[in-house]
UniProtKB/Swiss-Prot annotation:
Region span, Disordered: 1-46, 54-73
Family the entry assigns: Belongs to the WTF family.
Protein name per the record: Uncharacterized protein wtf12
Polar residues composition bias: residue spans: 1-10, 58-69
Pfam families found in the cross-reference section: WTF
Source species: Schizosaccharomyces pombe (strain 972 / ATCC 24843)
Top-level taxon in the UniProt lineage: Eukaryota
Subcellular location as annotated: Endoplasmic reticulum membrane
Subcellular location, principal: endoplasmic reticulum
Keywords for the protein's UniProt record, in alphabetical order: Endoplasmic reticulum, Membrane, Transmembrane, Transmembrane helix
GO biological process, one term: meiotic drive
Record keyword Nucleotide-binding present: no
Membrane topology: Multi-pass membrane protein
Amino acid sequence: MKNNYTSLKSSVDEEDELKTGHEIDLEKGPLPEHNSEGESTLPPYSDISKLANLVPEDSSTGPTETANPNVERRQEFKDLHPNIYSLLRLLIAVLAVSVVFFTAWGCVNPLEKSTFGKIAFFVLIGLTCLILLITMILEPGLIGISIMKRLIGDNGNDERDYFVENRLLSSPDCDARQHANSDTAIPLREMNPESEA
């Protein structure tokens, strides 16, 4: 049986396969000297090095909140029209709470004559007022973050943790390794003395 296989490779493809590392690619130019001890261990024409260079140079600070155009627009509107922004937030809060309130009131209203119905109605009014208050005080979208920052501050519990750690470590019968946290570095040989043998 005869095989009628025809190669799909052109003569240019075959020449590329036979190229040695000493030839010059006319599109890219001669390869510069590559120092593997430098910042990058990738060759200069590597596709990976091109992808790695897409990150901006000043990425040490991380992404900024103003990079999002929606945040910029909202901040600009808030700065230009502070009264309208507050009224708009109030309107959204009242509409959201009214939908929840009237839906729940429709479910609780038949039970209003019983003790359970009265308690449920007052709990419903209390929760509605609480939702309205939280919506007016906090920024939309940042509720969890804002509550934590307002309750414990921006620095978290740093001062309290520092005080507690100092009190624990200053006691005479305290072993410092028992109170290691994520900020404490313990060498591996101290954690596993058997590995030294």
